[in-house]
Regions:
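Short loop/turn segments that flank or connect secondary-structure elements
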Residues: 22-86, 90-114, 118-240
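Short, positively charged and aromatic/hydrophobic N-terminal segments
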Residues: 4-17, 21
Length: 240
């Protein structure tokens, strides 16, 4: 990975503990406080492998509304479980306002405030099709003008003595380059929408309803997902 200048603020990051970018920017947190001081590409080695999380599910509890789900997350979970988005809203996920936009997130329930997909044994019941934030953790995304790189959060994962693993292996995501392009463009859409809503607060509800209907509620017909998503994104430009 490549380092960065001392004191550089991370104004556009995604840690997985929040939709992240603006929230953390407002806190004016520096990269030195939360990372190992390096930025990584998908081909780099990083100390993130936690041994299959044996005996631990700390990052699956007490996360509040921070595990925000993007459209591909919903597609994966719906196809993997056979449930509709509406059915998931009845129990496993919920809607919350994130910087003015209504978005879905994993719902924490019970005394332990655990993810609804966590088994009694403390294991993930949707691991093969788990959300992107769960795949990413304990890494975060550092957004730049032309995409993003990854960084390692050093205070979040409770597992000690983590071993090195290639970022792309850790993410365990097919067609990773397409996925990274999708994530960067989705991030860009959210930023644009947040700016639009900030300038036109009276339109917040209508914009959120359009986002939910266009990107989440309307089923994706193709197995591949990305081309259909990008088509919908192009069609959505006229609402900005």
């Amino acid at each position: 990975g490549r380092g960065y200048g001392k004191g550089e603020l991370y104004s556009t990051i995604y840690t997985g503990r929040s939709i992240g970018e603006e929230i953390d920017m407002k806190r004016q947190v520096t990269m030195e406080e939360i990372s190992d001081g390096k930025l990584y590409s998908s081909n780099d080695l990083v100390k993130a492998d936690c041994g299959d999380c044996e005996g631990c599910h700390a990052c699956c509890t007490g996360m509040g509304s921070s595990i925000v789900l993007d459209p591909l997350d919903i597609v994966r979970i719906c196809r993997g479980t056979g449930a509709t988005f509406e059915a998931l809203l009845a129990g496993k996920i919920e809607l919350n306002v994130v910087d003015g936009i209504i978005l879905p997130n994993l719902k924490m329930t019970g005394e332990e405030e655990g993810c609804g997909f966590l088994t009694r044994e403390g294991r993930c019941s949707i691991h093969p099709f788990r959300p992107g934030i769960c795949r990413l953790f304990p890494l975060g995304r550092y957004y730049e003008e032309n995409g993003f790189r990854y960084f390692l959060q050093v205070h979040e994962c409770q597992k000690e003595n983590r071993t090195k693993v290639k970022v792309k292996k850790w993410l365990d995501t097919p067609n990773l380059k397409d996925y990274e392009t999708y994530i960067a463009r989705w991030h860009g859409v959210l930023i644009q929408l947040q700016e639009y809503i900030a300038a036109h607060p009276e339109s917040a509800k209508a914009v959120s309803m359009d986002v939910l209907q266009r990107f989440y509620l309307t089923p994706y017909q193709t197995e591949e997902f990305y081309s259909e998503f990008f088509q919908r994104m192009d069609e959505a430009k006229n609402i900005l």
